[in-house]
């Protein structure tokens, strides 16, 4: 009877432990989508029913402060690293690295030079190092080998590939036999049209409506694939856009000799590399050049921009006021819409919306930083974050309080310039699970030892009788 009781107890303890594990959910799935240049208030310029559908059944952040400079590549890399540009190294769309004597430009193949990207580790690599798989459809940097890795699946950048084809690939990767848990999707508009038309143009209305239809298509495909209720969808952007005009031009040729400097990056933040021996002359000429141009020595750049501690940031930074355009002369291209300005300006701010099992419903939040997205992603994916400048605490109120955990999310304790110090509550929620598992394991081990011990003791008399019986001589007939 005692033996049966111990056996039943052992089974119950084992079941209790297995239940502890089985109560943990499947791996969270995340799809991060960027509509390039989608300014925060585009949501209200024309009817955007699909964006508002996500706002109603998900979360919305009204003000997202991105990083300086407010350009495409620096901010897309910030979204997936949680770092300021000075820390992740992609400081502009066009750069020069004086240490390696190498250039980086969107228009050239040197964007595939891994060394430019390896001052940071993007989230798809961290996700894969944790044993998971990632898929990227045109997200900037995902077709570059970084730290000897690509995403598990990726589409080499080709702007002619339709939004629908990009969505099809993402759906395919999420529903394959070995599904991804992290997807990244990028679309070039409304940025392209915002540059050509200007954000205040009435012609931007149809462009925004088209983006809303594309979002509607994505939602439809996720529902068709039965992913809508299981996947966490995050919709964001890299920057906004502001209106420019031909009356607000700053021509560098009026103030500087072309032979005295190299213009590394252009409007509205001009990165200027003076020729040897010409620094003071160039700096003084620019300082008094134009009332709508503010000029900084690299070491004097305002701390709030976090834009001085990197060798790829040039010795002189000239920043135009909002709506003003810097060019060498009027023969250069002029854009009716532009971005790159001070990240404190509202017109530079992008959108942020999210929907999924991890997020609250019909919840609106006033503000966050774009650096905060990275620790949020790590939390959702249950992976340990690399050192970053964001704060999970700033965005944890976006989450459903019942959101389950699979493994503990750990925010790095390594602080970078401008970082928010990790707090004890960043770890909150992971301890009960491990305490439960530990106690369950101890109970099972104790019951197992007692059961085996009892089993051995109960079998000793039978073994002695068997031994005695074998030892008896065979009776002769």
From Swiss-Prot:
Residues glycosylated per entry: 101, 158, 292, 329, 362, 369, 382, 389
Disulfide-bond pairs as recorded: none
The organism's place on the tree of life at top rank: Eukaryota
Topology of this chain in the membrane: Single-pass membrane protein
Compartment(s) where it occurs, according to its Swiss-Prot or TrEMBL record: Secreted; Membrane
Family: Belongs to the nucleotide pyrophosphatase/phosphodiesterase family.
Protein name: Ectonucleotide pyrophosphatase/phosphodiesterase family member 5
Organism: Homo sapiens
Lineage of producing organism: Eukaryota, Metazoa, Chordata, Craniata, Vertebrata
């Amino acid at each position: 009877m005692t033996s049966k009781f111990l056996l039943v107890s052992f089974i119950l303890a084992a079941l209790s432990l297995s239940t502890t594990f089985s109560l943990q959910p499947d791996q969270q799935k995340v799809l991060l989508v960027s509509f390039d240049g989608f300014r925060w208030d585009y949501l209200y310029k024309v009817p955007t029913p699909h964006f508002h559908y996500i706002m109603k059944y998900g979360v919305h952040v009204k003000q997202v402060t991105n990083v300086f400079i407010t350009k495409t590549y620096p901010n897309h890399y910030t979204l997936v690293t949680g770092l300021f540009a000075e820390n992740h190294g992609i400081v502009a769309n066009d750069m020069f690295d004086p240490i390696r004597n190498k250039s980086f430009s969107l228009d050239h193949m040197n964007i595939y030079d891994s060394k430019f990207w390896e001052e940071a580790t993007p989230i798809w690599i961290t996700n894969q190092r944790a044993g998971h798989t990632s898929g990227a459809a045109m997200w900037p940097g995902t077709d570059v080998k970084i730290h000897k890795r690509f995403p598990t699946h990726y589409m080499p950048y080709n702007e002619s590939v339709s939004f629908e084809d990009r969505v099809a690939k993402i759906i395919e990767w999420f529903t394959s036999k070995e599904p991804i848990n992290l997807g990244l999707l990028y679309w070039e508009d409304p940025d392209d049209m915002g540059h050509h038309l200007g954000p205040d143009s009435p012609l931007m209305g149809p462009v925004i409506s088209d983006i809303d239809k594309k979002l509607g298509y994505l939602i439809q495909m996720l529902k068709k694939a039965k992913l809508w209720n299981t996947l966490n969808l995050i919709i964001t952007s890299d920057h906004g856009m502001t209106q420019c005009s031909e009356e607000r031009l700053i021509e560098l040729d009026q103030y500087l000799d072309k032979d005295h400097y190299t213009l590394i990056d252009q409007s509205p933040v001009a990165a200027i590399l003076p020729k040897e021996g010409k620094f003071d002359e160039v700096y003084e000429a620019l300082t008094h050049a134009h009332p709508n141009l503010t000029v900084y020595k690299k070491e004097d750049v305002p701390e709030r921009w976090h834009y001085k501690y990197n060798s790829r940031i040039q010795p002189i930074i000239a920043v135009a006021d909002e709506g003003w355009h810097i060019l060498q002369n009027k023969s250069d291209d002029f854009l009716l819409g532009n971005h790159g300005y001070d990240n404190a300006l509202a017109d530079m701010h992008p959108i942020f919306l999210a929907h999924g099992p991890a997020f609250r419903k019909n919840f609106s939040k006033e503000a966050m930083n774009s650096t905060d997205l990275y620790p949020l992603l790590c939390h959702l994916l249950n992976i340990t974050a690399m050192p970053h400048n964001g704060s999970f605490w700033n965005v944890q109120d976006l989450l459903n309080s019942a959101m389950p955990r699979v493994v503990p999310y750990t925010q790095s304790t390594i602080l970078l310039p401008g970082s928010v110090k990790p707090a004890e509550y960043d770890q909150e929620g992971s301890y009960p699970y491990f305490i439960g598992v530990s106690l369950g394991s101890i109970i099972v081990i104790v019951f197992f030892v007692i059961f085996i011990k009892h089993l051995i003791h109960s079998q000793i008399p039978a073994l002695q009788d068997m031994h005695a019986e074998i030892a008896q001589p065979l009776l002769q007939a």
